Amino acid sequence: MTLPYISDIQLFLAVLVSCAGVIAWLGLAARLHHARRNAVPVRIHVAGSRGKTTTARMIGAALRANGKRVLVKTTGTDPMLILPDGSEQPWPRWGPPTIAEQVRFFREAVRQKADVAVIESMAIEPEYLWASEEYLVRATHAVVTNVRPDHVEVVGDHPLSAANATALIIPRNGQLFVADEAAVAPILDRATQCKCQTTIVPVAGLHHDQSNRRLALSVCD
């Protein structure tokens, strides 16, 4: 059986059409994600070296008590989804954690008719922190619990490396709630650049549970 001859031009055109189809599909997927994300009017992105999970849970609980339909996602070893009725279910993963799962989270938020999404930041690398906020979450509120020298192999060992990385989740024209211990130059400078209204929450000297609670309640006031 003789295969039909395909010229270089025909092959090029076939590849070009295939690439155009992929680009069109990606564009459609991006528009669908943006529509779902924007259907959730309040999006709270919780970041920091320690206390993110506890703070995200507390924010969700306080907002539910105020009658809001809140969907919360925590990350870590055992990621959980906290539904608007307060019940919990494991967040399914089929491979390593990836910021792309925020797309699936917002799909679930729309399905749950949530008017508030609380998302624990799951990125460590600066480029992923930036991409998560810029392309996936577009938070209305950012919360920073602290900026301590964790993951130095990723963010570097400079005293302000963690702050420089964490600052990348600060949203444009949003609101920032930052614990006073984390209110350092990279965080505050980024907030100014992003025209983000900043609230510095005094937590110095408090036990970490009390610190998380005060920060969470400040967001909900």
Which stretches of residues belong to each language-model region?
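Short, basic phosphate-binding NTP loop
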Residues: T2-A47, T54-M58, N66, P202
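Catalytic cores of large soluble enzymes that bind and process phosphate-bearing ligands
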Residues: F12-C19, G51, W94-T98, V154, ...
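N-terminal glycine-rich "phosphate-gripper" loop used for MgATP/nucleotide binding
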Residues: L26, A123, E181
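Residue-level recognition of alpha-helix initiation/capping sites
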Residues: L28, T54, A100, A182, ...
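ATP-dependent carboxylate-amine ligase catalytic core
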Residues: H34-P41, G60-A142, N146-N164, A185
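Acidic, Mg2+-coordinating active-site environments of NTP-dependent enzymes
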Residues: P41, Q112-V118, A139-D221
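Short polar catalytic/cofactor-binding loops
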Residues: S49-R50, G76
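Active-site signature of alpha/beta-hydrolase-fold catalytic machinery across serine-
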Residues: R57-A61, S218
